[in-house]
Amino acid sequence: MSMVIRIFSDRTLDSVAEWQRAIDAEGFALRLSDDVPPSEINGVWLGRLHGEQTDFEFHPRDAQETMEFCGPEKFDHKWKYAFEFIWGGRNINNSTAAWMAATAYARATGGIVYDGEEGKLFSPAAALDVARDLEQFLPELRERKQHLMRRLATQRKQT
């Protein structure tokens, strides 16, 4: 199952270095791959979170169509740009990395984050709280995943 959040803004970031500075300013331990400028990304973006590999999809979208899709009544402003962050898979870092990257991008561009699952808009400050909550939960998720993997390995040996 894939999850999606969107950011809306009136300007874009010109480089990965600018985006990375915004991420660093939030104090996130996320490092983006820097081989392609954000304006040319339309697909999977690789990175590292706390030294571990992570990825999420990053797609530019038509802002007006995306606001219409999300429910135009939710927006008090016609944004110029929209980007989707999509993640899924088995890597527990992906959701946290996507929220961190989206939060930093939204704050750096004066934008907002939209979580379609909740149907809710988040200011950059509120999105920061979500990203921090997800980050604090990572050690427990890692522990649970390791426990589950050990259990599965034991069950395989017994059969």
Predicted regions and their residues:
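Acidic (Asp/Glu-rich) sequence patches and key acidic residues
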Residues: 1-159
